[in-house]
Amino acid sequence: MPLSPDEIDARRFAARRHEIVERILPVVEQRLSDGGSYVTIKVEEILQEASLSRSTFYRYFKDKNELLLALIGPVLQDVRIAAIRPLERTSAPTRKQLQADLAVNFDVYRPHIPLLNALVEVSYSDPEIRKHFQQGFADVHQTIAGHIAYGQRAGFVRPDLHPAETAAWITWMAERGMTQLVAEADAAGRGRLAESLAAMVWHTLYEGQSSS
């Protein structure tokens, strides 16, 4: 069935908006990496570096916060996929396996830490941004809780844990650790951080349980 004119226009709009987001993302991430604050970055500065006009920008985005939501969407999706990948196992990992998984997560998360920090910064004053940030990590929390509950039934996760509460601690401990510790660590430091986090999670979830 052929698309209607409205559907064609909507697809064109979405494609062009995505193109603009891809163009602006490296500009914003570079400014944030240089120590800038998203709150104080001016739209005009972003547009100048991205070679975009004001009219083009405001056709696709209501304001700078709506742009932030568009920029962060793919980032949160990448973070979510990386975070849940180690939990797809149906048996307990070894500490070395868990450490390797977390090292991969660090590599996915680290380039986007400035943008994620911007999301936290703006979330204090914008309820919609705050809701988006919390929902992004709520998905990770729910996946970890599901893994714990499944592992308890299968016998490879400790039975004395509260799945939802334990998952919440792991989720938000890791989120803060990524932004406060991993962001500034060199390669050797990141290795030690991955080893340390793996030890905490492994002892919390799997110690003393069957690995099969």
Language-model segments: which ranges?
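Helix-turn-helix
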Residues: 34-66, 70
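Short, basic, alpha-helical segments at the C-terminal edge of helix-turn-helix-like DNA-binding modules
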Residues: 43, 72-80
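Short, hydrophobic secondary-structure boundary micro-motifs
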Residues: 40-41, 116-119, 131-132, 160, ...
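Short secondary-structure transition hinges
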Residues: 111-143
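Hydrophobic alpha-helical connector segments
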Residues: 70, 84-111, 163, 167-170, ...
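Secondary-structure edge/capping motif, primarily at the C-terminal ends of alpha-helices
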Residues: 83-90, 116-123, 177, 181-185
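Basic, helix-initiating cap at the start of DNA-binding domains
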Residues: 1-41, 45-49
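C-terminal peripheral helix-coil segments that are non-catalytic and often amphipathic
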Residues: 1-7, 111, 146-154, 168, ...
